[in-house]
């Protein structure tokens, strides 16, 4: 469990808070507002908070997100693109963006879902048996799913559906930022209540 309470970030050169492959995160009274009277127009040059491939629940309560150049929060998983079928249930898969390289992604026992990368429609799933991360750009992934049964295995992507956290966002204020307030693409249950959004783009993007 991770608990952050009464944390004030007055300036950050990137994201103010980022969590990857963590579980059950609670953030209370977190602020990216500038000091009172400060002439500063920008506090965080990217997202205020960002949660990637997390498990359990992400909870944001009574937070004040101001003057970011991106979202107040972004909660999502990660896809890996299947490059090569090495065996019926073993594939080599790579990340779609260089900033994802080296991501922890999964551990044995996690549930892997295979999707058509053109449509993102599921084609099958199975538990992860083993994962070789020797190459930080591409991993060798062994699962219980027979990928050879798919017509075009190279047209697949893999997501770790054990890492789609639910989210509770309550009593938060978002304002003076140029992007969205909440970007929520997790598969988990989401509750947003008693919040105020004054962002340049959409308040809630699901």
Can you annotate each of these PLM segments?
Residues 124-125, 131-168, 175:
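Small/polar beta-strand repeat architecture
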Residues 2-11, 23-36, 55-67, 104, ...:
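Right-handed parallel beta-helix
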Residues 101-136:
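Ser/Thr/Gly-rich low-complexity blocks that favor extended beta-strand/coil architectures
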Residues 80-90, 125-133:
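A structural signal for short, hydrophobic beta-strand segments that form beta-sheets
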Residues 91-101:
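Short alpha-helix capping/helix-loop boundary micro-motifs
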Residues 13-19, 35-47, 56, 69-75, ...:
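Short glycine/acidic-rich loop motifs that flank beta-strands on beta-rich extracellular proteins
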Residues 20, 52, 76, 94-96, ...:
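A structural detector for beta-sheet-dominated domains
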Residues 47-50, 99, 155-158, 179-181:
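Short, recurring structural edge motifs at helix starts
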